[in-house]
Every structure is written in structure tokens, then in C-alpha cells.
């Protein structure tokens, strides 16, 4: 996923990038180094389309290139589009490349590094992907699968609570900085805690696997600037995805950079490590599902609805989730809180405050609609039109004025002088505003020097 500008101030839309798109943007040298790890090759192979997988398996044990024409005959003409997509994908990921055959024909051959390590991953052999923990003995504080799932959920929820401004949620400085670099949060004033952005609000609407994938993409994009080896940490992530849930792994042999990365994964909830200096760790379900869930990244949360909205702008949320309550508080005023329900009021001030932070009216409406209580789903439309229309109007009300910097010219001695300078500013394309009756005009700061120079020449010549 990437944040891309949209219409209006501070409006962005999250775009999802899957594993193939991310790897396709890496340099050939980085890709070849990545393919030096069997876990990476297997993870990439697993995410390929079925046609591309078929080609790779048919060529996996061939040491000589095949003619391109022969490979093309493997696919029927009606599947030419899928053939074109798979061909481009395998070339873009450097899984295969062209090679000139005797006689001048073009041939195709698998990348030898990828071929060798995919064989190892599929058939066994090579070095162990992780160090054995048998030398450490049995873990006195072993974790079972339910406790790992609970730990991962709690750790990730701390990150989400921090994004919505929950005072009880605290994260490391590295994580807070990463959230800002990713465009999910921003600092309004020096010394003030960061607040959520439009992109951050969209981020919270995604399901957990999509959130984690987007977040890890941002982490990887800034890894090298933090002095980390991108290939090393990517290979470790792929290695984690093939781990066994509930099994412990040793940190022996890890570099300092990788140990630091492990602490970040610990904060995200991807691994459990009892203490920072503990010699073993447990991958959680979030880490194991990370790369396999990439292709589905970008979906919104699918959960039972719990919000009822009335035409009087009252909002009733039947939930105990602190995160959902904090999300509702971003665009409404909290009135009452009960053990399993909160009551809030959607007001002009609360909506415009949310819009000032970069949250759009459409995002608020989408949030309410996707979390609507089953009772509301029975009516058409789901949300009262008076509510949706008013939220959009409050947004338009805030956006109706556009501020443009400029330089004012007034106090002209004659209408002729005014029209002469006005025509010159219009010709240069720097005119912002004019009022002929009052003989005043405004030009852009960039065009001010040219207009001023022209006016001085006219005064001297007259």
C-alpha cells in the first residue's frame, strides 16, 4: 500500500501493494541476494499465479534454456492475457531471463540462484533456517498457542490505540517516528503528541493482516536509512512465515541488526520474547500469516455491526472495544458511557475537527455504514440521508474558501494606468484577483517582481 494525494487538503488514499509489486521495485542486485535464501524463494513461489508456478516447476530441473516459442506453446491462445501477465511477472522478479540459443533463437532459463534455492526449499537439504533450541533445554516459561494469540492481539492493539490518541497507550520512539514517516500520524505543534491523519483513519479501517503488511512495507522502505540490511530482515520475515506456531526458536547466530529488528517485531506483536535478553523467541500467528496474507491485503474489517445512528444525530455504539470507542470519538462528542454501550452526538464542531485532521466526510460515512447494527441494515438506505448529507455539507462548509497568497496593487491615479497594469498581469498569467470599480488587483508573489518592474518602466517613460 502507498499513500497518494487526492482531491482536497490533506486527503490521501491508501493503495495496496502486494508482495510481487514490492519485490518488483527492488534492484536486481537486492533480488539476487534475496534469492540466496531458500525461505525467500519458497515464499515468492507460493505467491505466484498458477500459470507462473506451472512454468517454474516445468523448468526447475532444466540446466539449459528452452526456446521462447516452445514455452509459448504450453498455453492455449484463449489464455494469452494470463500468459502475458505471468511472463511479465517472472521477468520483473528476475525468476527467469532470456538467453540467446545457438542459431540466434531467443530462449528462457530460470535464474540459477532462484532455481538452486527453490530446489533446496522443496526437496530439503542445505543449512537449517534457524538454530536449534535443544542446547538451551526446555523452556520453563513456554507459551501455548492461545497465549501467543492473546499476546499478539494485545501488542498490536497498543499500536492502534496510540494512533487514536488513547492516553494509556505508549510506544517506543522508533515506532512513533515510523508512524509519522508512513503518513499515518502527524505532529501539529512542536512538543504536542502526534494525531491521526486521513491515511491513518483509512489504515484503521483495514483488517489486521492488511494493516500489518502495509506497516511492514513502510518499515522495510526506511530500513536502509536506519543502517539495517534489507535483504537480511526480509529473509528473516520470510523465514518466520514458515515457522511452527507454538514452537520456540533460538537467537544464536543473529547479528546485532537482526536482534534489533527482533525487538521491533516484539513490539508489533509478531514475536514473543519474555525478556529483551532472552535467548529464545516464539513467532506469533501474525508473523506466520504475514506473507501468505499479502494478496488479500487491503480489505476492510468484517465484523458484526454495532452502531445505531438516529436522525437527531445521536449515535449508539453497542461495544466494549476501547479501540472502536476511540475511533467514534474522533468525529463525535461522547455523552454517556455504559458497561456495554456508549452514546455520542455527531456535531458540526466534532466533524469539522475530524476534517481538520485530514479525515474526510466519506470516510466517516463509510465507517458508520460498515459498522451499522443489524437493525439498521434492514432499512434502505442504511444511514439516514439527513445524517450523510449534513456530514458532507459540514465538509463543504470548511472547504468553501481557498486561500491564495498574493501582493496587492491599489491607489492608481487613473483608470488607464490600472487597466494597463491589469492587462500586463493577465498576460503573464499572474493575476489572482481584480476589482475595476475600486481600481485594485492582486498578483501572485512569484509574478510581483515582473509586474513591479513593468510598472516602473511605464512611470519613467511617461
Curated annotation (Swiss-Prot):
GO terms for cellular component: core TFIIH complex portion of holo TFIIH complex; nuclear speck; nucleoplasm; nucleus; transcription factor TFIID complex; transcription factor TFIIH core complex; transcription factor TFIIH holo complex. It is found in: Nucleus. GO terms for molecular function: ATPase activator activity; double-stranded DNA binding; RNA polymerase II general transcription initiation factor activity. InterPro entries: Tfb2_C (IPR040662), TFIIH_p52/Tfb2 (IPR004598). Gene3D superfamilies: 3.30.70.2610. GO terms for biological process: DNA repair; nucleotide-excision repair; transcription by RNA polymerase II. Its main location: nucleus. Keywords: DNA damage, DNA repair, Nucleus, Transcription, Transcription regulation. Pfam families: Tfb2, Tfb2_C. The C-terminus (residues 305-462) stimulates the ATPase activity of XPB/ERCC3. Component of the general transcription and DNA repair factor IIH (TFIIH) core complex, which is involved in general and transcription-coupled nucleotide excision repair (NER) of damaged DNA and, when complexed to CAK, in RNA transcription by RNA polymerase II. In NER, TFIIH acts by opening DNA around the lesion to allow the excision of the damaged oligonucleotide and its replacement by a new DNA fragment. In transcription, TFIIH has an essential role in transcription initiation. Belongs to the TFB2 family. PANTHER family: GENERAL TRANSCRIPTION FACTOR IIH SUBUNIT 4, TFIIH, POLYPEPTIDE 4. Component of the 7-subunit TFIIH core complex composed of XPB/ERCC3, XPD/ERCC2, GTF2H1, GTF2H2, GTF2H3, GTF2H4 and GTF2H5, which is active in NER. The core complex associates with the 3-subunit CDK-activating kinase (CAK) module composed of CCNH/cyclin H, CDK7 and MNAT1 to form the 10-subunit holoenzyme (holo-TFIIH) active in transcription. This is General transcription factor IIH subunit 4. It comes from Homo sapiens (Human). The lineage of its organism: Eukaryota, Metazoa, Chordata, Craniata, Vertebrata. The gene is GTF2H4.
Amino acid at each position: 500500500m502507498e499513500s497518494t494525494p487526492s482531491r482536497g487538503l490533506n486527503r490521501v488514499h491508501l493503495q495496496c501493494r502486494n508482495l510481487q509489486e514490492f519485490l518488483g521495485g527492488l534492484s536486481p542486485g537486492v533480488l539476487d541476494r534475496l534469492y540466496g535464501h531458500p525461505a525467500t524463494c519458497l515464499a515468492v513461489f507460493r505467491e505466484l499465479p498458477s500459470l507462473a508456478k506451472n512454468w517454474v516447476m516445468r523448468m526447475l530441473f532444466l540446466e539449459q534454456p528452452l526456446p521462447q516459442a516452445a514455452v509459448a506453446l504450453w498455453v492455449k491462445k484463449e489464455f494469452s492475457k494470463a500468459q502475458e501477465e505471468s511472463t511479465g511477472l517472472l521477468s520483473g522478479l528476475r525468476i527467469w531471463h532470456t538467453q540467446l540459443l545457438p542459431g540466434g533463437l531467443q530462449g528462457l532459463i530460470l535464474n540459477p540462484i532462484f532455481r538452486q534455492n527453490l530446489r533446496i526449499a522443496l526437496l530439503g537439504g542445505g543449512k537449517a533456517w534457524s538454530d536449534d533450541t535443544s542446547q538451551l533445554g526446555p523452556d520453563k516459561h513456554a507459551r501455548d498457542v492461545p497465549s501467543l494469540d492473546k499476546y499478539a492481539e494485545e501488542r498490536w492493539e497498543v499500536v492502534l490505540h496510540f494512533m487514536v490518541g488513547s492516553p494509556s497507550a505508549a510506544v517506543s520512539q522508533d515506532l512513533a517516528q515510523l508512524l509519522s514517516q508512513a503518513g499515518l500520524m502527524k505532529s501539529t505543534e512542536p512538543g504536542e503528541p502526534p494525531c491521526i491523519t486521513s491515511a491513518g483513519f483509512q489504515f484503521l479501517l483495514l483488517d489486521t493482516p492488511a494493516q500489518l503488511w502495509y506497516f511492514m512495507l513502510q518499515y522495510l522502505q526506511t530500513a536502509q536509512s536506519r543502517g539495517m540490511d534489507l535483504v537480511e530482515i526480509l529473509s528473516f520475515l520470510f523465514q518466520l512465515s514458515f515457522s511452527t506456531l507454538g514452537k520456540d526458536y533460538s537467537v544464536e547466530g543473529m547479528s546485532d541488526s537482526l536482534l534489533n529488528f527482533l525487538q521491533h517485531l516484539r513490539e508489533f506483536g509478531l514475536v514473543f520474547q519474555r525478556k529483551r535478553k532472552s535467548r529464545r523467541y516464539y513467532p506469533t500467528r501474525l508473523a506466520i500469516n504475514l506473507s501468505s496474507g499479502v494478496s488479500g491485503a487491503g480489505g476492510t474489517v468484517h465484523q458484526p455491526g454495532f452502531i445505531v445512528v438516529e436522525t437527531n444525530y445521536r449515535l449508539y455504539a453497542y461495544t466494549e472495544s476501547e479501540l472502536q470507542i476511540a475511533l467514534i470519538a474522533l468525529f463525535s462528542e461522547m455523552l454517556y458511557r455504559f458497561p456495554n454501550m456508549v452514546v455520542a452526538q455527531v456535531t458540526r464542531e466534532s466533524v469539522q475537527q475530524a476534517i481538520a485532521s485530514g479525515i474526510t466526510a466519506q470516510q466517516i460515512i463509510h465507517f458508520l455504514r460498515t459498522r451499522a447494527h443489524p437493525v439498521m441494515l434492514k432499512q434502505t438506505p442504511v444511514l439516514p440521508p439527513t445524517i450523510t448529507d449534513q456530514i458532507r455539507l459540514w465538509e463543504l462548509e470548511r472547504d468553501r474558501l481557498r486561500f491564495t497568497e498574493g501582493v496587492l496593487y491599489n491607489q492608481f491615479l487613473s483608470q488607464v494606468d490600472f487597466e494597463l497594469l491589469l492587462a500586463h498581469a493577465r498576460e503573464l498569467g499572474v493575476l489572482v484577483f481584480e476589482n475595476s470599480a475600486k481600481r485594485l488587483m492582486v498578483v501572485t508573489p512569484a509574478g510581483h517582481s515582473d509586474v513591479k518592474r513593468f510598472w516602473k518602466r511605464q512611470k519613467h517613460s511617461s
